[in-house]
């Protein structure tokens, strides 16, 4: 009876958590990234997984007993997803989610979509030099916007009732710091592809006289956007205004981008598995000579290794 009473008071839960420390073999001090609860977990599965890969985040069904917690069923490690990615996914599953308590309740009542995130578990963090590449966005209601005040710091363009404000020096790769003012909806959408780019963008807008908070509403990786779209069966379009200003990409440049994407797509399964890709075969399929392909993939591997070392330090 005591065991049943304990289980009733401590229900099994699916948790997203990170490793704080390992006090003994197969034992891990974990932190639930949404409730911030710390718990001691016994999991030989985690020990086995850590022999072949590093993970930033873990997802598992956790049951507790009076001495420690244990995992039941699959333990899913995520190479590149962060708590912000999971929160974004949850709001796409249920648009009524507003905070961590809502998210935890959604996982408890509807765990299946979160279990399907295993399809993106091996996707790596993307970096451009030292910058983490991800969507960083915020949206505000504004009564009006005098775009003339922005011309010293921004390049401006107009199309179909929407002004695009591209921050000078920060509007190109990897930051892509831009804002879109919709004069019909009286909304201002801020978008950048790095945290630094978003910080510079909000600072420049405040310098132009518009008092906005520095915090982002959305911070999500391209990998999660892609994975969520596949799981939910619909396209998730974060940059709804960018198509109004789409510039024609030269055929040669587009072909080069397509070949690069194909090369990385073919090589990633081997890279994520920790084995050497078949450079000659992959290069031939993607339209590269082996030497060039090897150089590109060496850079990709270096970035993934850098991510792994960073996650270990954390």
What are these regions (language model features)?
Residues 43-60:
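Short nucleic-acid-contacting surface segments enriched for D/E, G, S/T with interspersed K/R
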Residues 108-171, 175, 225, 229-258:
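Short Lys/Arg-enriched alpha/beta "domain-start" segment
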Residues 91-116, 179, 194:
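OB-fold/S1-family RNA-binding modules
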Residues 210-314:
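Extended, charge-rich intrinsically disordered regulatory tails
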């Amino acid at each position: 009876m005591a065991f049943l009473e304990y289980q009733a008071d401590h229900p099994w839960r699916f948790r997203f958590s990170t490793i704080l420390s390992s006090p003994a073999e197969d034992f891990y001090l974990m932190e639930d990234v949404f409730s911030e609860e710390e718990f001691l977990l016994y999991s030989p599965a985690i020990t086995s997984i850590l022999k072949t890969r590093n993970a930033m985040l873990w997802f598992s069904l956790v049951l507790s007993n009076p001495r420690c917690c244990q995992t039941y069923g699959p333990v899913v490690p995520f190479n590149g997803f962060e708590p912000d990615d999971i929160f974004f996914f949850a709001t796409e599953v249920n648009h009524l989610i507003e905070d961590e308590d809502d998210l935890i309740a959604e996982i408890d009542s509807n765990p299946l979509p979160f279990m399907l995130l295993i399809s993106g578990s091996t996707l790596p963090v993307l970096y451009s030099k030292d910058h983490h590449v991800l969507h960083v966005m915020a949206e505000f209601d504004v009564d009006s916007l005098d775009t003339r005040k922005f011309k010293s710091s921004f390049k401006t363009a107009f199309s179909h009732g929407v002004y695009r404000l591209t921050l000078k020096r920060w509007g190109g790769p990897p930051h892509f710091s831009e804002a879109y003012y919709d004069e019909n909806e009286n909304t201002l959408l801020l978008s950048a592809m790095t945290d630094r780019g978003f910080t510079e963008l909000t600072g420049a807008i405040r310098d132009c006289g518009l008092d906005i908070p520095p915090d982002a509403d959305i911070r999500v990786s391209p990998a999660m956007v892609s994975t969520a779209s596949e799981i939910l069966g619909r396209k998730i379009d974060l940059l709804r205004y960018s198509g109004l200003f789409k510039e024609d990409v030269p055929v040669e440049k587009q072909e080069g981008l397509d070949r690069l994407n194909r090369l990385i797509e073919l090589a990633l399964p081997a890279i994520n598995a920790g084995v050497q890709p078949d450079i000659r075969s992959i290069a031939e399929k993607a339209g590269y000579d082996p030497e060039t392909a090897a150089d590109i993939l060496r850079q990709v591997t270096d970035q993934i290794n850098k991510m792994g070392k960073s996650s270990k330090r954390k």
